[in-house]
Amino acid sequence: MKPTSLNSSSSRQTWSADTYSEHGRFVADLAGAVFEWLAPQAREKILDLGCGDGALTQKIADTGADVLGLDMSNDLLSAARKRGLSVRSGDGHALDFSAEFDAVFSNAALHWMSMPEKVIHGISRALKPGGRFVAEFGGHGNVAAIVTAMRAVGARRGGDQSLAGPWFFPSPEVYSEMLSDASFDVCRVELHPRPTSLKTGMKEWLKLFRKPFFEQFGDETDNVLDEVEQLLRPSLCDARGNWTADYVRIRVEAMKPR
């Protein structure tokens, strides 16, 4: 999952570029399939929605495309600028582009955006007629075991369980209908289970991606982390101590009519 902070102030996810690079690098590393779907071409104008630290934005730029990265995390945008990329701060719910892009691309960001219909309509406005929308993000069933464990511990401790799973993880049927309602021509929408190795362990994943859930427990944060990890150990950790997250991804390609 890749950063885009979009929730209210009390539950807002924040990001450190250094921490993300250390514990979340797999997000960009595992994006080969959706990048192939995008197939960027030289001189195309492309919007990378939820660009994060610019790892994939750089890959798009390397093809000769004219790419603009958009994100809400200033720290991650700073890291992207250090790569020499063109990026700006912006909310995926309030895209202010009009028929500017040949393609809109997004990897591991759309599940952070809680009003998907607004996002889809903004993407449609941003695209030129005949432009394409290509994205991958969390699909139905993504990190279900992890969220269930957090909710269980949160309930036992009297915490806000909603902070365990703030994401939008649609099925292909639901998302296809949303795209059609926004007048997109749906080319393909696929769901792919993708068990994902966590090289730095489950606790680092939890701290990186669900900080607001754990911080609500104050001085008990470390103990709550321990409890969630122990609940997950039997199903997501092997005999050698290697952790795997139960990722499920939805991959999308749609076209704006000419």
Which residues does each PLM region occupy?
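Conserved class I S-adenosyl-L-methionine
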Residues: 1-44, 55-59, 76-79, 134-157
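Class I SAM-dependent methyltransferase SAM/SAH-binding core
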Residues: 47-95
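A short acidic, Gly/Pro-enriched loop at the edge of an enzyme's catalytic core
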Residues: 93-104
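A short SAM/SAH-binding and catalytic strip from SAM-dependent methyltransferases
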Residues: 103-116
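A short glycine-rich, Lys/Arg-flanked "PGG" loop and its adjoining helix->strand segment in the class I
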Residues: 117-132
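Short alpha-helix
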Residues: 168-182
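C-terminal helical/coil "lid" or tail adjacent to the Rossmann-like core of SAM-dependent
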Residues: 187-240
